[in-house]
Amino acid sequence: MGDTMVEPVPVKLSDQSLVLRGNGGSALCVITEGVGEASLVIDPDVAQKACQEVLEKVKMIHGSSVESLDKVDGGDAGDGGSLANGDTEPKLTNTGHTSTSSRINEEESPLDINSVKNARRRQKNNSAKQSWLLRLFECKLFDVSMAISYLYNSKEPGVQAYIGNRLFCFRYEDVDFYLPQLLNMYIHMDEDVGDAIKPYVVHRCRQSINFSLQCAWLLGAYSSDMHISTQRHSRGTKLRKLILSDELKPAHKKREIPPLSLAPDTGLSPSKRTHQRSKSDATVSISLSSNLKRTSSNPKVENDDEPVRLAPEREFIKSLMGIGKRLATLPTKEQKTQRLISELSLLNHKLPARVWLPTAGFDHHVVRVPHTQAVVLNSKDKAPYLIYVEVLECENFETSLVPVRIPENRIRSTRSVENLPECGITHEQRASSFTTVPNYDNDDEAWSVDDIGELQVELPELHTNSCDNISQFSVDSITSQESKDPVFIAAGDIRRRLSEQLAHTPTTFRRDPEDPSAVALKEPWEEKVRRIREGSPYGHFPNWRLLSVIVKCGDDLRQELLASQVLKQLQSIWESERVPLWIRPYKILVISGDSGMIEPVVNAVSIHQVKKQSQLSLLHYFLQEHGSCTTEAFLTAQRNFVQSCAAYCLVCYLLQVKDRHNGNILLDAEGHIIHIDFGFILSSSPRNLGFETSAFKLTAEFVDVMGGLNGDMFNYYKMLMLQGLIAARKHMDKVVQVVEIMQQGSQLPCFHGSSTIRNLKERFHMNMTEEQLQILVEQMVDGSMRSITTKLYDGFQYLTNGIM
């Protein structure tokens, strides 16, 4: 922690053992000096701490003489009284006299009475210490980070059990951030920690099907480092089997199945109801030996047998991973792309279904994958691919009806509900726009929904009074809502901004067979959404959304997940400290020890793609995209570049991120840079070559975008780095504990060596003054700019992989 941080309650981790073992000293209420002429009331804990410090100093000075003196005093302890803190009073001086207080105690307090009093005092002191720790746990500043720290560091079962119960009081999203840490502690730490964590995990699994699957995937991934014989009988494996057995279903009443001829009651007239079809999409019958079987649509079966909740989603994810494995066997990228489109086209025959994209943050059902938009990403040995997924947002994933399949060749008859979310559509009207699946008993995939030849989609009536003139501008848009005073805008400013926007529209990339992802990633996200929606049979639904995801097979994403957690923690720290640094953490989903999913960064392409497509330097590309160096657009993009560059330089330094070639650094449409691919952090480096020895990557091209070494923006960059490092070290414990807990039982390359955590702590430079930190930042910036190893590694990547 930094010098300015003050803990609200000064309780150390070492106090826990004192609290729960009951070994605290007796309460010290009064200290008597001399013959009782003066007395001073002192806080008992302060006095005890002071006595302990004095005793330690005496032992350091006198060594063994103190120990011998203690033995002598201990032998005579029965002859005299004792102080309230348990230490014996001085007996006989050199002249043979005893103190007045000693004589009083000998006369008035027998030994047995003193023992009882001391026991009572120790009990009171123990209760006081317990209340101290309880006050810490119940104070408003006690957050999830502190709870995880106590759970990891405490050796007392009582504290661990209390923290396990305390987890129920925190928000779900706060605890979910530490889910990898909780599950790793459950797998690799002692039983007391596991017993404290398990009730919360089981409770959440009963509440959420998405949480259940994430736990199962993480438990499998973090158990993979164990020996195979140990892994079979580990707690993590047992809990994973419990989750996947679907025994943790919520204990609620089964859903009622509507009659076959009626739709859910949405207030429609009887004549309209007769056109609705009912659907039973809940029951899943699965035969693992013959892949997937079609959903049973018999209502009688559904009422008798509860569905397997997790099977459809698991099979959906398994299908996506299988595509990636098959693509990796093909030699050329063109063949991989053709195979990917064919595989996804077949996948669409199983959709819509009660499946979802785990990287999304809202409930939805997957209805379609536009297969022609999918692309294979750059990778030498593997075949990661990017897909776009059409979903329909719903209120509850498990209880909402799955929309019916609409054939691809069906022509939509209307576009009038393209922008319905803002037009006053009620929940009942939105629900009535869905039809349901007919009762077919065909044999097909477990997570698919039956195809329908003919479909009648009923659209809700529009409230025209709330949507009239939706594209017209109101005069109120340029006036304050409280005050109707007009805001005057100079005509010259309007003309200048319009001319800048027209003259410097973003460029497009040409199609490259060796890099098909460049064109797809360069297209603005808003245009892509509009284009795909227009060509989708589901695009007319008001709750239609477009998501994207990168599917990776053959890569261990556990290090990526760890780096993502550190980035989120640093982002939160800099926001709380009001340091204007910019980073873009992206979601990582670990499926197993060698597969997972990644949230793509939209509106961003790699610097390698920029240089290859434009054949320009980074500065000239900025000028081409944002206008001349005096325009508002360029200055904004330059500031964004500086703020993001400073942030990622600190991230790369603290985590020792390697493999920083231009294919792993993105540039978005607003000028930010985003680092991706954190496969080499902390103690690991590519092939252990040791090319990259600088603190971070800072090339001459980066400095040129900042305006040169003597520019104001370059000085601003160094100032941001200093402010960011000062803010980060104030909260060092929050960052370090995320990494330290994941080292337990891990065989990841980033944890090789015994000094990983110690070196991480040293990079926060807790012993330096701010002036010394400023000198350090200057040295790191200068060393990174002049680093010959950075140039060597870029050259190595160009020769071996063609990365510019």
Curated annotation (Swiss-Prot):
Q: What are the subcellular locations of this protein?
A: Endomembrane system; Mitochondrion outer membrane; Rough endoplasmic reticulum membrane
For the region G-loop, what residue ranges are annotated? 529-535
- Record's Gene Ontology CC terms? cytoplasm; membrane; mitochondrial outer membrane; rough endoplasmic reticulum membrane
Residue ranges for the region (Catalytic loop) are 656-664
Ranges for the region named Activation loop are 675-699
Catalytic reactions of this protein: a 1,2-diacyl-sn-glycero-3-phospho-(1D-myo-inositol) + ATP = a 1,2-diacyl-sn-glycero-3-phospho-(1D-myo-inositol 4-phosphate) + ADP + H(+)
PIK helical domain residues: 55-245
Keywords in alphabetical order, please.
Answer: ATP-binding, Endoplasmic reticulum, Kinase, Lipid metabolism, Membrane, Mitochondrion, Mitochondrion outer membrane, Nucleotide-binding, Transferase
Q: What are the BP-aspect GO terms?
A: inner ear development; phosphatidylinositol phosphate biosynthetic process; phosphatidylinositol-mediated signaling
**Region entry Disordered, spans:** 69-122, 251-309
MF term (GO), any: ATP binding
EC number per UniProt: 2.7.1.67
**What is known about what this protein does?**
Phosphorylates phosphatidylinositol (PI) in the first committed step in the production of the second messenger inositol-1,4,5,-trisphosphate (PIP). May play an important role in the inner ear development.
Q: Which family does it belong to?
A: Belongs to the PI3/PI4-kinase family. Type III PI4K subfamily.
The entry's protein name is Phosphatidylinositol 4-kinase beta
Which species does this protein come from? Xenopus laevis (African clawed frog)
- Gene behind this chain? pi4kb
